[in-house]
């Protein structure tokens, strides 16, 4: 671990992102549970959970980011998660929520890049966040596909077919 003299604001910003990655995992787990338990989309739930929910705490995001923070001399602190007991009315509500969550997370990463880009000694942090933004762009696109497919299948009265076809329009 290197000893950098990051300001408390930079440390907070970095740890807020770490917390956001874990929050995203929790939110995605809740979506997977809703798909599986009462929205009757067990196949979609399994695929979504394995291909989307699992990336947030992994070495793609949270674990990787915490390692970067340690290497840069910032002690990682995972903040509290916000609970969500919401029950979704249908698959459209699920994937609207998912899209909103991922778009907001990408915006947070882009804002962090903008803030850190002007700070000395933050080059490594910025480069890592730029890679996150690149990955997030693909995930936003995937979320938009799911959202549009959910609308189409629900409007056609074919939620059962959405579950069957989910893997076909999952490109991640």
Where are these predicted regions, by residue range?
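Iron-associated oxidoreductase/ferritin-like identity signal
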Residues: 1-172
